[in-house]
Amino acid sequence: MVTVRAYTEPDIPEMISVWNEVVEEGNAFPQEELLDERSGAEFFASQSRCGVAVTDSGIVGMYILHPNNVGRCGHICNASYAVSSEMRGRHIGEALVRDCMKSARELGFRVLQFNAVVAENAAARRLYERLGFMQLGTIPGGFRMNDGKYADICPYYI
């Protein structure tokens, strides 16, 4: 069973591990730099909310939630999700997205937008669409993969 809750400081090392795994895979996050304990603590503390998915074995997934813009567009937020590779396909991502959607509303955001969903990430796209997110279009070659090739990205919102 998975529980999603707000992160606490002792969670940071496990969060960094999950985050860095996705960064190293190079097919979902735009970030290229890995987090260390200091940069991870600062990064997670700067978010509007970080949620962690916890099982008996520890933290197996996480999300970050923050404003996507400022001023007149400050009611739009953005989020990123990470699930450890050995736990994918077990609906942990869905639990994270649902908790994030609830948190976004509680924080006063009116729109949740994903700027750069890699078109080849079929599992994420199916999940977002099943939860009611709408695809805004496609940006050809908007994401540079680890192998140097460029993949399309699909912005989504709800």
Predicted segments — roles?
Residues V2-M15:
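A short beta-loop-alpha structural element at the N-terminal edge
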Residues I16-E33:
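Helix-loop element at the rim of GNAT/NAT acetyltransferase active sites that forms part
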Residues G89-A104, R125-R130:
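Conserved acetyl-CoA-binding loop-helix of GNAT-fold acetyltransferases
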Residues E129-I139:
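Conserved acetyl-CoA-binding loop of GNAT-fold acetyltransferases
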Residues A28-E86, V97-R98, S103:
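Acetyl-CoA-dependent GNAT
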Residues A104-V117:
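Conserved GNAT acetyl-CoA-binding A-motif
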Residues Y81, I139, N146-I158:
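Terminal substrate-recognition subdomain of acyl/acetyltransferases
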Residues R88, F114-A124, G142-N146:
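Conserved beta-strand-loop-alpha-helix junction that forms the acyl-donor binding cleft
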